[in-house]
Amino acid sequence: LGLELSDLESLRTWGSLTPGHPEYGLTKFVETTTGPLGAGVANAVGMAMAARRERGLLDPDAAPGTSPFDHYIYAIAGDGCMQEGIASEASSLAGTQELGNLIMFYDDNRITIEGDTAIAFSENVEARYEAYGWHVQHVDFTNGGTTYEENVEALMEAIDNAKTVTDKPSFIRLTTVIGWPIPKLAGLAQVHGAKIGTEGVSALKEKLGFEDKPFAIDLEMVQQVRAAFAERGKGLREVWDEKFAAWHDANPDGAALLERMLAHKLPDDLDIPTFEPGKMSTRKASGAVLSALGPQLPELWGGSADLAGSNNTTMKGADSFLPEDRCSEKDPGGPYGRTIHFGVREHAMGGILNGITLAGLTRCYGGTFFVFSDYMRPSVRLAALMKIPSIFVWTHDSIGVGEDGPTHQPVEHLASYRAIPGLDIVRPADANETAVAWRTIVEHTDRPAGLVLSRQDLPTIDRSKYASAEGVARGAYVVCEASAEPKVILIGTGSELSVALEAREKLEADGIATRVVSMPCQEWFDEQDEEYRESVLPSSVTARVSVEAGIAMGWAKYVGCKGASVS
């Protein structure tokens, strides 16, 4: 499996393959980095949704259970997960979506770090999941608190029962004892994520009949277990390969699409729209770009946290991703639809997007107002940590949000999201920059991106007069050159680029040669070679001013100690 005894011996040490919280991309077969509790529940819901969408793209007409793309998503959650809001949000949506391919085990050991869960957690979790629309079962290893027996047969029977329920996700409450069978520690909070000590280890080994020496492993037994698993896996793989080969031969178009999606490649002739001079908000432009990309990229799908009309996240003609019984004349669609209705669940949306992305074949986006991105920040951070290409669409990006006032004005958000390592924050200045931004984002497969868009109409820059928007792909570019050797450089993003261009006209009229730079993405610009960066922001020009409708934090790097920021 890629892990050896030495890796277990280095558990929770710097640079090991066995950190305290397993990391995607570091350790083989780790399917997601959960870390914060509840994140994995949302990831699992996303994976189950992705499995349904992938089947719809590749094998929609196959009878249930016969497609090579039919599979189950299994998740394990604990008492802490059940208390986290993201798990509640995601579980609610999973019930609404009738995700019969999702089976979740709840390790009900009634212990968290501070002690017995009774001090903070008292609801009937089974009833809660029944209310969400899940199929619920209970397997009690404690036999009502009398004796402890890990009844694997009962657990397997529950799994088999879950598979017979195809119109509901399944929730299996598994009542256990934490730390069993460690003498004096089983059932206590002291064993939750803490070392049990030499005495505890010795007592456990005596209880289990092991030798009392460090890492006493019967290597012959290990080899036997590995061989047994390999043999079983080989047989299962042969059955699946036969089924897949039959599908592949019968579906050449689907096979070609699958090959492209597995390679994470875009069509060679991917086309994005261009926009004539005029006025258009970048959120509206984004909607137009999505509608243009839709027919070219069937793997691209997504939606909004109840703000689709404002976020412009619905592709033209895209049906809803919904069970048949929830579709209507207003919301036509089906289980293989393309438009996701996340509901008012920003945090779950972020985790679900990550789960869909981790599933590996499709690309997904989710939208909300930029100010509400605070509700999904942990999921965004995890996407950056995992280096996965989730796409976050955030509209209403500044004080220009309309009548809602300070609660909806995201003045600090640009700086705070730029502070997350590995996250691209892209704030295009007009419709054409938005188109190039979208194309560049879908070209990247190794990092997430936040696309930050305006509510209000912005001037669509006349590209016959100013530089091409293709410079967006490099993060920053000279949109308007000075009339002579520049004395001043104005740097603008988003809605403030047009302000910078107006300011240039006044400065030039006063005889001050002024260059205007559009910098929609600091992260992309920082990746450019030094020669290009120097060509855009020559070190000889120290009179620099950044203009952005947000706090100035982070701009000193670009304007320098002699520059200034209008914020």
Residues covered by each model-derived region:
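Short, flexible loop/turn elements at secondary-structure junctions
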Residues: G15, A77-G80, N143, T176, ...
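Thiamine diphosphate
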Residues: L1-I73, A228-P459, A469, S535-V536, ...
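Non-catalytic, alpha-helical, charged scaffold/linker segments
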Residues: K205-V239
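Short glycine-rich or small-residue beta-strand-to-loop segments that form or flank ligand, phosphate
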Residues: E31-T33, Y74-G78, Q137, R338-I340, ...
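Short acidic, Gly/Ser-rich segments with clustered Asp/Glu that frequently serve as metal-coordination loops
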Residues: G80-I86
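Short hydrophobic segments within beta-strands
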Residues: I76, F105, G303, V393, ...
